């Protein structure tokens, strides 16, 4: 009995050692060889090291492995399909130049993958996540696709430190990063420029964090939320030089928009079509046609401690924007510091109003019946 137990213990140790060796295996693929053949031979946990060259194939990853490019090998799927499809959880893709004309550069239908330091171009979607969770997408250069990164029904992913530009090859629909029916994602510290309709678009997506992104020179919006994209946090982004709004909400509620910079847009921050119960706080909007614009039944929003400087209008409310609370804002050197054609908007909270560089003792807001009974005589520092 003791001999049998000892034999089983030795066998268990041997199995662990061989499993460890298998996890550490590295398979090298040279120019002219097949990456897919190496994937088929690999065991879970293996690393496939691909040397420089052009590989004309569409890869299917059906097991968790690391695929590493040396000196930026190119995967060109042509009309065959997506460049790489991740079916298995827990893979890592790094160091590739990925191109395809018909489909997606990297198509993810699995969880807990890492996609980093790749160049992806000339695709329908550069990277697409479809019902995929907890993936990390970082430090990629994604350019000249229809959409840079597209998430569909995908939650708890992190997209950070990517350079996403010129994703506008299809004029009907083009975005830098687009989310649909997706929640609890973190999108932060990306550089997005010249991405067609919008650099960062959320549709029917809730509880996402958009933080510290630099967004510029889009045909319509820098950041856009639509179709009940509710309860998102938009903070510390810089939206510059977009043809319409730096930040745009359409039919979206209970979002927090704070500490953003929006400058040189047609509108800095624009709420429209029943975008209600949002908080706009500590934003800096300057050199826009309208700094902050509320329209089309956008109601019950709170605008607090924002600075609007050198815009055509600092804060502009159209006739159907009502029951908004506006206080402790700094409206400085705008063509019109404030304009209110709405109804029942409050320009103070009963204790503090706003600072206007064209101050009167009681500030009657042009456009309608708006009155600030407690205007500040000096801006808060």
Stretches with model-predicted labels:
Residues 20-24:
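Sec/Tat signal peptide C-region and signal peptidase I cleavage site
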């Amino acid at each position: 009995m003791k001999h049998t137990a000892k034999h089983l213990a030795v066998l268990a140790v041997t199995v662990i050692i061989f499993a460890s060796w298998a996890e550490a295996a590295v398979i090298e693929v040279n120019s002219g060889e097949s990456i897919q053949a190496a994937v088929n031979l690999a065991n879970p946990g293996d690393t496939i090291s691909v040397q420089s060259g052009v590989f004309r194939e569409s890869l299917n990853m059906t097991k968790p492995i690391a695929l590493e490019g040396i000196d930026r090998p190119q995967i060109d799927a042509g009309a065959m399909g997506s460049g790489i499809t991740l079916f298995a959880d827990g893979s890592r893709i790094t160091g590739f130049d990925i191109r395809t004309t018909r489909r997606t550069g990297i198509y993810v239908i699995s969880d807990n993958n890492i996609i980093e330091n790749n160049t992806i171009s000339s695709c329908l979607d550069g990277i697409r996540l479809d019902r995929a969770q907890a993936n990390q997408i970082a430090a990629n250069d994604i350019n000249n696709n229809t959409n840079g990164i597209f998430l569909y029904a995908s939650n708890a992913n992190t997209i950070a430190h990517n350079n996403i530009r010129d994703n506008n090859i299809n004029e009907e629909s083009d975005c830098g990063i687009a989310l649909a029916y997706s929640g609890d994602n973190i999108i932060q510290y990306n550089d997005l420029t010249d991405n067609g309709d919008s650099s960062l678009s959320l549709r029917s997506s809730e509880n996402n964090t958009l933080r510290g992104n630099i967004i510029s020179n889009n045909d319509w919006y820098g950041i856009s939320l639509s179709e009940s994209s509710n309860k998102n946090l938009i903070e510390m982004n810089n939206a510059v030089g977009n043809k319409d709004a730096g930040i745009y909400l359409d039919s979206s509620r209970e979002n927090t928009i704070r500490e953003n910079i929006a400058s040189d847009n047609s509108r800095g921050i624009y709420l429209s079509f029943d975008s209600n119960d949002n908080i706009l706080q500590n934003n800096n909007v300057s050199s826009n046609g309208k700094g902050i614009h509320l329209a089309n039944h956008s109601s019950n929003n709170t605008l607090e401690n924002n600075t609007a400087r050198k815009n055509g209008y600092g804060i502009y409310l159209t006739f159907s924007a009502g029951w908004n609370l506006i206080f402790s804002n700094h409206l400085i050197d705008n063509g019109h510091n404030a304009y209110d054609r709405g109804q029942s908007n409050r320009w103070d909270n009963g204790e503090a109003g706003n600072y206007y560089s064209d101050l009167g003792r009681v500030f009657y807001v042009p456009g309608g019946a708006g009155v600030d009974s407690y205007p500040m005589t000096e801006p808060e520092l």
